[in-house]
Every structure is written in structure tokens, then in C-alpha cells.
Amino acid sequence: MKRLWPGWLLCVLTVGLLAYMGCVKAPAISLLIGGMKIPDLLPFGYDLDGARSLFAAFASDLADAQAGGRQSASEAYLALHAGYDLVFPPLFTISLGFCAFAALFRPEKPIETPRLAAVGFGLVLALAFTYLACDFIENAVADSMFGPKALGLALNEQFVFVLRVLTAGKYTTSILALALIVALWVWRLVSVRRATPPAAPT
């Protein structure tokens, strides 16, 4: 496992970045829009009525921000997507792939990897890259709906369902990938126990 320390460090940094976005950046934006959560934090997104309320909250805050000369929630939301949330998805994707790989990596006691475990590893990679696509496209759609320029127009209601599907897809693929990683590590622990000879009686 010593050879894998850069990967574990990357995982720690990824978790730290997620915690910072979820506990610092997102609440700061929510505070400006009456406590409503940004779409990224809702596993099933907003329905049409919820999206209308969120749009109105962003628009109201934008007017207040322009009058007060401060950054609006909408601008902060776009900045989040252009900054931290631009870096996080690829980091999380790499971390998922690494955790799956680490479960199969045993150079000190090489064992044949069963086909089922190899398939599980492949599925983790497929889910991780699907998550990556969903997250990036979700951010782009959300920006086009709640960005400062969009707030001067009517809400694009056709995008509401699209955003919900992308958000649900993001959460579903990441949860399934994590579940498969747990299964791979359980397989690893069971394999190690079976390969360890019983202690000789004294």
C-alpha cells in the first residue's frame, strides 16, 4: 500500500474539496437566496415549481446585489462552477478509479483476479466517467438557467427536466460506483483471509 500513497493523498484532497464546497461555498450562496439549496445538492433536483421559486430567488438577489454593489448569488454560483466545481468532478472520477484499482492491487501476494472482480473494476470506471459527464453537463445547464444573463429572461422550463435527469444521474452513478468499490474491498479482505494459512497449534 506504500506505493499507492499518492492516490490516497488525492482521495483525501478530493474529500476535503467536497467538504469545503458543501459546508462553505454552497451555504454562502443559499444564504443569499432565502435558504434555498442550489440544484447541485438535491439528488433529484427541483421540480418545475421549485425551479420557478429558485429562479425568482436568484433574480431578486441579483437586483439587490446590483443596487448594493456586491456579488450576487447567481454570480457566485457561476464562479463555483468555473472554479472549485470545475476541478472536483475529474478529481472524484480519478479517486473512484483509484479506490477500485487499490482493491485489486496486491504486489506482495499476487493472486489471480477473478473475472467478476475485473468486471466490477470495469463497471466502476464506466460509472465514474458517466458521473463526470453528468456533472459537467449539469453545471452547464444550471448556468444557462440561473446565470445573471438568464435571469433577465423568462425561466427556460424545458431545461428543468433535463437538469433533474442530469442531477439524478450524477448521484446515481456515483453511489453505484461507491457501492461496487465497497464490494471489491470486501472481496479483497475475504481473499486475504482465505489465502492466509491457519496458525500452527502450539
Tell what function each PLM region has.
Residues K2-I38:
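N-terminal signal-anchor transmembrane alpha helix
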Residues A79-I94, R164-L176:
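Membrane-interface loop-to-helix entry segments
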Residues I94-G120, L189-T202:
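Cytoplasmic juxtamembrane regions at transmembrane-helix boundaries
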Residues N139-V160:
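Interfacial helix-loop-helix junctions of multi-pass membrane proteins
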